[in-house]
């Protein structure tokens, strides 16, 4: 079994395993790629709980874990967690090339490269690496313009000059910046340069056709790719993303401009990585993510060294601001500052303990409230507390089901969860103990079984659904309405219009189900998007509507089928119960 950081893939694997004992009984080796991806992000907490589940089955099969990471400073914690020993760690410092790191400083007139290299044989400072040039005046233009004249143009110019060492990857923090920098890079390409030639014509044709089908003839995805400028962001639909990533592996583009969706998902052969920013959607990226992306430099397999640069715009800033930003960049460039891999489940428990304390609730009382499902008494923001518990509840129920062949005993928890990552790392904190972690888990499982019942058949039904418990229960409550809608459709003529109406009516019923409303991005054109999507209209037509890309790629391609599958499972169980009666 090979797991990597693709959210949908991990969820699909988890759901398949929970509902298939034959697969579970065969697992002997689990390989976790990008194993450092643990923490407080929702999907990371869910993944951590999944690994806790896997441990049960792998141990029962006499199997092993192999965790891989290039940025893991506390490997011993994870070794103890997955192998019951801190000694099962193998470290290798080999790289396919040397590493050179530095700051790409733009002062409004020139780009200076300030390298952090300790190698005395090479210059640690390349002044005026790029100098701005006057641009010819256009008719009736009075103001003199230069190139580069802003940070994006400076980054594009630097990447263009560094292309002679091999492909360059430019990391950007938000989706719209991908094309913004691509447009500036396009200006750097000289008319006399040879046309970019694709080595694998089949891959190029597949990508081009997918783009035209999805975005239309004039899409910028194709326009830039023709020039060796490969762009990648989270807006890519899978029909385009897959051939694009295949194309990236087979070609040597001039430049790749991407958000972190590419940096952690695809192994790239690039010589240089330039960070246009150290922020992602307004928040600082972690030092762990920084080095995971930076580690792509020097993988073109023809490099003596991989170059890593962080862009720094010092125009119109005072000295204090400039120095503060330089220190921040230097902190990222220091590998000893890489973030530890930490248990998101432990942080969740600490957070709820803190929330309770702020509301004057002692930990013992918090435990009682969790066991009795009196969540509304913990904090006024009931939905937020429930959302946090939803991240771990189905995983806890799955483990409780596996450890209880008969009955509803909690005796297994002490021996099992003393080997959990949350318990192991509790020793590093003063505000939580390992025993409190165990008490929390026992109380939460009591609350879960009180909420869903103590019948194993119910546990197994909820666990195999793969969605959070609260959402599963909400769907079950709406089952009679869904049955009525389906029955009306069954006696209809089953035309395309009636099928579209069927989906619309079901969506209206489940609109307030947690997992539906959490993921759904509304649009004034939702009816038109739904109709065109189900009618097989070209994606290039659909994407013209508001939020169409997210609605199709996230909602109709992933989330909605997931919810419908759970609804079908409940319907089937309902039919079985009805026949038994």
Residue ranges: model-predicted function:
Residues 2-9, 13, 570-580:
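Single conserved hydrophobic/aromatic residue that forms the stacking wall/gate
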């Amino acid at each position: 079994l090979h797991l990597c950081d693709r959210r949908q893939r991990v969820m699909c694997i988890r759901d398949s395993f929970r509902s298939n004992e034959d697969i579970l009984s065969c697992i002997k080796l689990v390989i976790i790629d990008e194993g450092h991806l643990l923490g407080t992000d929702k999907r990371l907490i869910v993944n951590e709980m999944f690994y806790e589940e896997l441990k049960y089955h792998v141990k029962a099969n006499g199997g092993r874990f192999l965790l891989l990471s290039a940025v893991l400073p506390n490997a011993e914690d994870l070794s103890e967690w997955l192998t019951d020993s801190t000694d099962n760690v193998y470290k290798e410092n080999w790289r396919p090339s040397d590493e050179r790191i530095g700051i790409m400083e733009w002062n409004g007139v020139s780009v200076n490269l300030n390298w952090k290299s300790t190698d005395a044989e090479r210059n640690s400072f390349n002044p005026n690496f790029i100098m701005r040039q006057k641009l010819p005046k256009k008719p009736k233009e009075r103001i003199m313009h230069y190139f580069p004249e802003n940070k994006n143009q400076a980054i594009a110019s630097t990447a263009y000059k560094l292309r002679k060492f091999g492909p360059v990857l430019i990391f950007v923090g938000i989706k719209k910046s991908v094309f913004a920098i691509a447009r500036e890079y396009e200006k750097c390409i000289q008319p006399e340069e040879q046309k970019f030639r694709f080595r694998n014509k089949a891959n190029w044709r597949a990508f081009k056709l997918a783009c035209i089908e999805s975005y239309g003839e004039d899409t910028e995805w194709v326009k830039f790719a023709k020039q060796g400028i490969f762009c990648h962001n989270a807006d890519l639909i899978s029909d385009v993303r897959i051939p694009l990533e295949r194309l990236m592996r087979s070609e040597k583009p001039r430049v790749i401009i991407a958000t972190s969706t590419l940096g952690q998902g695809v192994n790239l052969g690039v010589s240089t990585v330039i960070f246009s920013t150290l922020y992602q959607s307004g928040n600082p990226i972690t030092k762990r993510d920084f080095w995971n992306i930076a580690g792509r430099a020097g993988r073109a397999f023809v490099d003596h060294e991989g170059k890593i640069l962080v862009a720094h715009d010092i125009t119109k800033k005072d000295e204090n601001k400039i120095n503060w930003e330089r220190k921040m960049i230097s902190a990222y460039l220091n590998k000893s500052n890489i973030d530890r891999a930490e248990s998101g489940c432990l942080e969740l428990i600490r957070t709820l303990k803190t929330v309770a304390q702020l509301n004057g609730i002692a930990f013992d009382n918090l435990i009682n409230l969790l066991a009795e499902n009196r969540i509304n008494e913990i904090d006024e923001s009931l939905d937020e507390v429930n959302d946090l518990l939803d991240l771990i509840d189905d995983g806890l129920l799955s483990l409780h089901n596996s450890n209880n062949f008969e009955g509803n005993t909690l005796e297994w928890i002490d021996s099992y969860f003393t080997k959990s990552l949350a318990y192991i790392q509790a020793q590093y904190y003063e505000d939580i103990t390992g025993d409190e972690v165990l008490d929390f888990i026992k109380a939460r499982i009591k609350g879960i079984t009180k909420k869903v019942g103590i019948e194993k058949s119910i546990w197994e039904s909820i666990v195999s659904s793969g969605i959070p418990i609260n959402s599963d229960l909400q769907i079950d409550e709406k089952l009679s309405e869904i049955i009525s809608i389906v029955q009306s459709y069954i006696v209809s003529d089953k035309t395309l219009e009636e099928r579209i109406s069927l989906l619309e009516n079901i969506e209206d019923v489940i609109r307030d189900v947690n997992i539906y409303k959490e993921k759904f991005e509304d649009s004034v054109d939702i009816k038109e998007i739904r109709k065109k999507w189900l009618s097989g209209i070209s994606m290039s037509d659909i994407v013209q509507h508001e939020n169409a890309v997210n609605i199709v790629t996230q909602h109709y391609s992933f989330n909605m089928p997931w919810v419908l599958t759970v609804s079908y499972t409940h319907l089937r169980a309902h039919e079985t119960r009805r026949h038994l009666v």
